[in-house]
Amino acid sequence: MNQEYIKVRGAKEHNLKNINVDIPRNKFVVITGLSGSGKSSLAFDTIYAEGQRRYVESLSSYARQFLHLQNKPNVESISGLSPAIAIDQKTTSKNPRSTVGTITEIYDYLRLLYARVGIPYSPATGLPIHSQTVSEMVDIINELPQGTKIYLLAPIVRGHKGEFKREIMNLKKQGFQKLIVNGETCEIDDLPKLDKNKKHNIEVIVDRIVLDENLGNRLADSLESSLNLADGITYLEIVELPTAANTEYEKNQRITFSEKYSCPVSGFQLTEIEPRIFSFNSPFGACPKCEGIGKEFFFDRDLIVPDHRISIKDGAIVPWGSTSSKFILETLKALAEHYRFSIESPFSALSDNIKTILFEGSGEEAIRFEFHDGSKTQVIHQPFAGIIPSLQEKDRTIESVLIKEELAKFKSEHKCTACNGYRLKDEALCVKIVNIHIGEVADMSIATLQQWFAHLEQKLNKKQLFIAERILKEINERLKFLMNVGLDYLTLSRESGTLSGGESQRIRLASQIGSGLSGVLYVLDEPSIGLHQRDNTRLIETLKRLRDLGNTVLVVEHDEETMYEADHIIDIGPGAGIHGGRVIAEGNAEEIKNFEESITGRYLSGRQTIKVPTQTRTGHDNRAIELIGAVSNNLDNVDIKIPLGTFTAITGVSGSGKSSLMIHTLYKAALKHLEPTAKVFPGKYQKLKGLEYIDKIIDINQSPIGRTPRSNPATYTGAFTHIRDWFVELPESKARGYKVGRFSFNVKGGRCEACQGDGLIKIEMHFLPDVYVKCDICNGHRYNRETLEIKYKGKSIADILMMTVEDAMQFFEKIPLIYEKLITLNEVGLGYIKIGQSATTLSGGEAQRVKLAKELSRRSTGKTLYILDEPTTGLHIDDINKLLKVLHKLVDMGNTVLVIEHNLDVIKTADYIIDVGPEGGDKGGKIVVHGTPADIAACSESHTGRYLKQYLK
């Protein structure tokens, strides 16, 4: 029966208060509400989780063991549910082999296109490569010395899985006796059983020949047989050369012959032109030097000696420590004596020649080393290997993972010198379409690529066009979808690990539209994140198109424009955490405005707003940080000035260069200056001035505050340290002799050892997801019975960890050290979270605000530069209002706050704006305009200014 609604009854997951809701099917539905109100609990943890669980449960038990089965959500019933697909922001692969091209499958079609219509060119001559005839092959073989023993091999299997019983049976029937299987020669009757799940190489020994003048047609006949067996390819293996032969060839050398592709001048040959040779994830295509990563790692002098101001004796050479090793100290003393320098001088005082010898070694020059072991002295004359060669040798020979990780701290990366960062073998890069190889195509932006493909059809001949027609259609469709979701600035070669959550979500959204599915429930988590207002309209049209295909589109969203375009809105609230979890309002945007209890409605109707400041700050006496000549990524020799003591916003369309300018260049360069040992690699620039005016630079990002369940807001902000100190001072604790460690769940003593302070025990299930059960020894309290007997105002330390920030504030009202830490968490809008809530359960926005709270609670020097990249991610407009008060408070304390932001409510409150653009990718990287919000709004060339104008009225 085709139902009209997805009916949810009795939803109680997380903070949901037994809610009932009817979601119209085949509509564009927005779920909104304050951060932490229960939107994701309804959309993802209830509706999507149940849809996914029902699908997985329908599979066989064998299939289920390979899939993650969702726990049944806490809901009485859900009817009218369709197959569910979640497009969230947490599933970006960090694998360096995953790229925009591989995620969207465009690169797979590109590989097919190049394999079918690409033309190979000789790297040596630049001429097209032609096939070899059997006669040409015979002539090449006859150039070998007479008496050379050779094998002619037919490679019938090259890197494929299987047992190949039929192929081997056919070879037996044809009379072949010997094979080379995975490098081992064996009789065809004694062939070992092949593992069908492993890749194999099988070569038939077609003929064994000793070259002489009387061979007649035997060579040509054997070549033809071999070529027929292996689809036009044969190998010649030199088994033995005559003793007195003077030749460039070597024993065991292989020569590849192909009826298809071979350069007559240089001898460069292609065994095949198949899609796999264009794959950097295949051994047939990957560059052998970087193994398809496109990067090489090398020991970096600047990481080995990060601070040139200190001496060798005091530890300038970091991997060699502070020369506590007697052997290292005596080695360095011998070098200093030989080359007449002092290990007590600052490293910067050493000559370039001495530095080169220290890093690279003394070459052939022997040095007198004198080593003492207490009882005797040993004198050795030998060259000095050098710091870098010594580290390379250690890295190559050591097996300890810990030591390898330690050595990795001294490595940097650069483009692979063999493939120039293209990831592929020369064989793949020599195949071109209209003089462009596949690596160059992958480096084009989506917008440039779309234009290139638009003109490509005119440049292909009739045969090529006939072959490529369907491939081009698939590629063009996918490019169009990526353009429609505002990702025209990305390149296909961009690693997926470098994408923001919003970018990766929109890529998967584009892929879903390309799949053309209907009758599906799509659940999306804030797809507008990271998107400039200009591109938002295109995104909304894409979501509508997904709906028009016959799907239900359920979007967790705070964006006003999206709400106005939605068919239906569900507002969860009224507050966050325990104050939320109810359906406050339902209807379209106009209807939501009329609900008094709806905070969303108040902002939509204009009853509540974020006010434009009446005046802007001008900063500290014209002091500024000045970055000159930034050229990282797409930046076009950019110069900027950031006035200190202001709230400055960096704006611009997606991909314009904001993060390249602020994070990759300014932040990393300033951090490197303030902390020379920091392992950061700034983008290229000429000068950075004004750093003498700041003492710290802090990037408050959305990365987790901890990786384990034991990390929580109380431990991160330092509140828990004071809470433990307070418990230690209680009379009962003193009487028992308890120390601070007694109240820690990270060390033995006071914690429950059954669960090691986690409060939960993990039980592995084979056909079901792992189950976490409450520890039955401590009942989930994390501590042992004796520790829990210590109470303050009737509450144990475990009870306090279960309190919300609001409750804990009231509880510790009279204890300033604890209260001050908690009040900052409340100020950033996190009053609803539990102070002991696991860090792994906090959203990116919540983690960022916990970090902000920690900064607020510090004693301010008034000389800190804070950088925040899109701090409004995941925030309701009311939360943004609270966040702005906190950020402006930091500025009022004398600090400088720099935000990269698209949200116009934030931008309009800035003292100073730097607009980067005008477009994304190659068409960006310039400063369009800078100044006050009014200056930006007055600039006709600024996309930001055009939209900002409406917000300043």
From Swiss-Prot:
Keyword flag Cell inner membrane: no
GO CC annotation, single: excinuclease repair complex
The keyword Transferase belongs to this UniProt entry's keyword annotation: no
Pfam family, one: UvrA_DNA-bind
Residue runs in coiled coils: none
One record GO biological process: SOS response
Domain ABC transporter: 320-599, 619-949
Binding site residues for ATP: 33-40, 652-659
One example GO MF annotation: excinuclease ABC activity
Residue ranges covered by zinc fingers (C4-type): 752-778
Subcellular location: Cytoplasm
Keywords tagged on the record: ATP-binding, Cytoplasm, DNA damage, DNA excision, DNA repair, DNA-binding, Excision nuclease, Metal-binding, Nucleotide-binding, Repeat, SOS response, Zinc, Zinc-finger
Recorded family membership: Belongs to the ABC transporter superfamily. UvrA family.
Xref: NCBIfam families: PRK00349.1 (NF001503), uvra (TIGR00630)
Functional description taken from the UniProt entry: The UvrABC repair system catalyzes the recognition and processing of DNA lesions. UvrA is an ATPase and a DNA-binding protein. A damage recognition complex composed of 2 UvrA and 2 UvrB subunits scans DNA for abnormalities. When the presence of a lesion has been verified by UvrB, the UvrA molecules dissociate.
Subunit structure: Forms a heterotetramer with UvrB during the search for lesions.
Official protein name in the record: UvrABC system protein A
Organism, as annotated: Rickettsia bellii (strain RML369-C)
Gene that produces this protein: uvrA
